Amino acid sequence: EPANHTEEALQTFIENLRPIVKCAEQFGVIIAIEPVWKHIVCTVERARKVLDAIDSPNLQIIFDPVNLLCVDNIDRQDEIINQAFELLGDEIAVVHCKDYVVEGNELKSIAAGTGSLNYPLLLKKIKEHKPYVHCTLENTVPENAAATKEFMEKTYASV
């Protein structure tokens, strides 16, 4: 939705998020937002703007690199991953790990290690900047869980 990517939409999002973060501060909990290409917070830069505008340790980031990709920017995935750790690294609370393949004009989410995401780079950045961050496996089912776990462990050990 193009309207999601406007500055007006971002400012509306920030103003509506402020009271939610204040509530999180009062209860001593963390709230995390997940940048997604199709949503208002659709880039690493916009996520940084939200964090700076709210300025609270109780607001953090769920980083899902696949969700920041689209067919128009997949050739820049390394830049996006690097930028995420540069601009958001301290505030990344969780990393969602999945992969993607291109089907037509869309990205299809699949299990980590079975698609085109640069996992050596992602896991190297995690190891360097957030070695104890929680990572969740998405698009993993009983049939691929063991292989996905093995892929993640071997790749992490190799970087």
What spans do the regions from the language model cover?
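Histidine-acidic metal/acid-base catalytic patches
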Residues: 18, 44-159
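Active-site acidic/histidine proton-transfer and metal-coordination neighborhood
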Residues: 1-61
